[in-house]
């Protein structure tokens, strides 16, 4: 909202809430987008209404999962498999990082209020005996006993969870998951289905083992991690905060959905500017790259509309 508020007083900006885009509309030949169909909900009266918004240019930014789903739902005679999907690439190459939450327990209470202020990339490009990327490590910003409860043994008393929380030094580990066309977003019976098989697990497991070794050696040096207790939890398909890759950009219309300006190869005026455009995702948070790319595409659109 900090980015939206400064422009809300402009006459050419309108923000509609309680709205869900259900279909992207095209002209008769399917060469350009004419607008979007929107469903409005009124929870107070349990009513819905539908409206159509038109525009010379349509930009989709629903997140990699929902942007792909919207295109797949927007079927027509010209696009029976989904809009902008002549390549059959829409929804494919879904990525969200191999991630692991790891908690080390210290002999000292951890009262640091600014934990998420640094990152560790020492192993990002591998090691001398393992010349393959492994990933990044960073502290977790905050940690509560309720977060430990989900992974603690049954009937663990609350006071024990609080002690563990007070002594916790939590870490977040990320390794790149590789683009795989079989990892994908699909629309089945009107609902969204994610199909995903983890990959690059050798690098992921090595990063976890390597970091545990670092923590253990830190403990031997100064007793900070003397308990040698490490709670680990891999983040599975439900943790898709770093979703990307479902409408990859590229120069070949047969192997990508978008061109290098994030315009759909199949349509003259449809753009996608969320994490969908990633052809690969690296092993760091994608947010800043998504923002930078959106600004880049915005500059392109300004030039186009002059």
Annotated model-derived regions:
Residues 1-8, 16-18, 199, 203:
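Short beta-strand to alpha-helix junction loop
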Residues 10, 23-27, 36-114, 274, ...:
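Glycine-rich loop(s) and the adjacent beta-strand/alpha-helix scaffold that form part
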Residues 12-14, 270:
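Short, conserved active-site loop motifs that form the nucleotide-linked donor/cofactor pocket
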Residues 14-16, 223-224:
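General small-molecule cofactor/ligand-binding pocket signal
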Residues 17-19, 40, 251:
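Short loop/edge segments at beta-strand edges and connector loops
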Residues 22-25, 35, 172, 199, ...:
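A glycine-rich dinucleotide-binding beta-alpha-beta segment and adjacent secondary-structure elements
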Residues 87-206, 240-245, 265, 272-279:
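FAD cofactor-binding and catalytic pocket of flavoenzymes
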Residues 280-301:
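A conserved FAD-binding loop/helix module that cradles the flavin
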């Amino acid at each position: 909202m900090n980015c939206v508020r400064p422009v809300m007083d402009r006459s050419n900006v309108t923000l509609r809430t309680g709205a869900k885009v259900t279909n992207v509309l095209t002209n008769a030949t399917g060469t350009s987008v004419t607008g979007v169909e929107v469903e409005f909900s009124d929870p107070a009266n349990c009513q819905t209404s539908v409206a159509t918004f038109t525009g010379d240019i349509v930009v989709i930014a629903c997140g990699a999962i929902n942007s792909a789903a919207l295109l797949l739902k927007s079927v027509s005679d010209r696009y029976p498999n989904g809009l902008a999907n002549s390549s059959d690439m829409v929804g494919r190459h879904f990525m969200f990082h191999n991630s692991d939450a790891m908690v080390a327990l210290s002999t000292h209470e951890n009262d640091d209020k600014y934990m998420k202020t640094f990152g560790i990339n020492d192993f990002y490009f591998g090691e001398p005996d393992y010349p393959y990327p492994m990933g990044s490590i960073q502290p977790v910003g905050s940690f509560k006993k309720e977060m430990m409860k989900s992974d603690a043994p049954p009937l663990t008393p609350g006071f024990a969870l609080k002690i563990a929380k007070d002594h916790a030094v939590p870490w977040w580990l990320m390794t790149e998951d590789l683009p795989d066309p079989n990892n994908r977003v699909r629309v089945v019976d009107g609902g969204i289905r994610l199909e995903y098989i983890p990959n690059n697990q050798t690098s992921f497991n090595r990063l976890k083992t390597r970091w545990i070794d670092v923590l253990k050696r830190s403990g031997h040096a100064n007793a900070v991690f003397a308990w040698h207790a490490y709670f680990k939890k891999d983040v599975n398909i439900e943790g898709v905060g770093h979703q990307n890759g479902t409408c990859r950009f590229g120069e070949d219309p047969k192997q990508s959905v978008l061109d290098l300006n994030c315009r759909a190869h199949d349509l003259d005026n449809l753009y996608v500017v969320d994490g969908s455009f990633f052809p690969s995702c690296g092993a760091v948070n994608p947010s800043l790259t998504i923002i930078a790319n959106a600004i880049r595409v915005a500059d392109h659109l300004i030039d186009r509309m002059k």
